[in-house]
Amino acid sequence: KAWLEENIRWKDFGTGVRLGRLYREDACSLVLYEADSEVTVDAFMPHSHPGGEAYLVLEGEVWDEDGTYPAGSIVWMNRETTHTPKTRGKTLILVLWPEGVKSA
């Protein structure tokens, strides 16, 4: 995955999670999230998305209040749905936020 390090500027949250912003225009963002295999269970805080959220699990596994999503899963969260995602194993997720993120 050398391309990740060469082409992405990462923001490290210090919780085992880092974010790489691929695109942003106004409130719309396309980002990569990478979580270590040893990430703390509360590394992602409860949040919602005014315009919904779509994500593709590229590696690892994500789970939240609504289900478990292994690598290859495409997930859509409806507008204003609040969730608290967790990860299992080293995880890489491609995420689209049409209208940003809101803390719950």
What are these regions (language model features)?
Residues 68, 79-104:
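Ligand-binding loop in jelly-roll beta-barrel domains
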Residues 39-64, 71:
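Glycine- and acidic-residue-biased ligand/ion/polar-headgroup-sensing regions
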Residues 27-29, 36-41, 100-101:
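Short, charged/polar surface micro-motifs in flexible loops or helix N-caps
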Residues 73-74, 82:
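Residue-level marker of beta-strand positions
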Residues 21, 32-33, 42-49, 65-67, ...:
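Short histidine-centered beta-strand/loop micro-motifs
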Residues 19-21, 30-34, 54, 74-76:
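Conserved hydrophobic/aromatic beta-strand scaffold that supports enzyme active sites
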